Amino acid sequence: ILDDLDSGKLAFDFGCEDIHMFVEQVLTQRLGDVGKKLHTARSRNDQVALDLRMYLRAEIDEITGLVKELLEAVVAQAEANKTVILPGYTHLQRAQPILFSHHLMAYAMMLLRDLGRLGDCRKRMNVCPIGSCALAGTTYPTDRRFEARKLGFDDIARNSIDGVSDRDFCVE
């Protein structure tokens, strides 16, 4: 379905309430009544929470990769400029002579902290809400840990209400 949407073979039906109903409709058209089972042991609440976490996880991974590339470039420039001397400033005044490489490595240290923050955020965010349903779980015998592993999550939400309502990771 995603490939068909991306290629233009399929257009979103704005008559559907949201993307979840659209996907269910297309699956039902393509597979018959079994497509209606997509919603079994699922709620839009846990699906939206899942989608948001998966989206942000991918964005964090993308940003992490970009920061690593920048870090490598900064370190390479520091290596290439080990003997370049320039004035160091404090209070808008020249203070001491410093090496350009030392100045660049200050930025490398900042980028390393940023990588740590991104990693910490990813750890807290990479919790799977699937199975929380609307807010109180499901009576269907689902294997939440299996689903979480298959979707690339490190853990499952320990509390179903928190699983569908938690958005503090977005602030990070």
Feature locations, PLM:
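Glycine-rich anion/phosphate-binding loop at the beta-strand->alpha-helix junction
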Residues: D114, L118, G163-E172
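Short, charge-dense linear interaction motifs
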Residues: I156, I161-V164
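A helix-coil-helix interface module used to build multimeric assemblies
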Residues: I1-G137, P141-A157
